[in-house]
Amino acid sequence: MSINKNKNLSSIKNKKNQDVNSRQELIKVYAPDIFDSKLIGKTLIKKRNPADENSSVDNKIYQVSLADILGKEEFSSINFNFKSLKIFNNECFTKFHGLTLTRDKICSLIKKWHTLIEVEVNFKTKDGYFLKLFLIAQSKKPKNMKSKTVYINSSQKRALRRRITDIIIKEGINMDIKDFIHRIYSLKIYEKIEINCSKIFPIHQVNIRKIKVVENSTL
């Protein structure tokens, strides 16, 4: 009786015995110029084709906590997305691709008996980044208010959204992306919003929930 031997089994076995690391290489990943091209970590990628060194890093997104970049724990709720731009001598350089607030932070901002204000703003920075920004803020109890609830009526919410939108656009269009990001985590833009909106209704806990890059800089 003859036994048919599957020739594919031996080839599969040989493939399994190959060292996985032999098909990968370790590269260093650097933050964009916004953070002075600081080293943010290392990662394994597939070995590149010598004819096209950029093929293995095209469109790859790296998410990094701002706390790790700056070495300050108070910024652990902010995550940055960096997109791979080019690779040279096992060093990957990136560009800004967005910002998100952690889920835990967003949940901590939502309180009962208060009004949560959400604002969406579209604008273009001085150096050509077209951004979609999502901001949230919480109503704040006025000093002389005795009521337990701190609700904002519809007309006040519309006025607050207009005021916040105007502030963000005026700030954003006159800055490049580096200055605008620095303005965010220095909290100066939040302080400006709180002061200007207090004339309509007091707010606090102002935070940018998310930034999407709709169009990258062409400069």
UniProtKB/Swiss-Prot annotation:
Its main location: cytoplasm. Pfam families: Ribosomal_S3Ae. InterPro entries: Ribosomal_eS1, Ribosomal_eS1_euk. One of its GO terms (cellular component) is cytosolic small ribosomal subunit. It comes from the Eukaryota. GO terms for molecular function: structural constituent of ribosome. PANTHER family: 40S RIBOSOMAL PROTEIN S3A (PTHR11830). Component of the small ribosomal subunit. Mature ribosomes consist of a small (40S) and a large (60S) subunit. The 40S subunit contains about 33 different proteins and 1 molecule of RNA (18S). The 60S subunit contains about 49 different proteins and 3 molecules of RNA (25S, 5.8S and 5S). This is Small ribosomal subunit protein eS1.
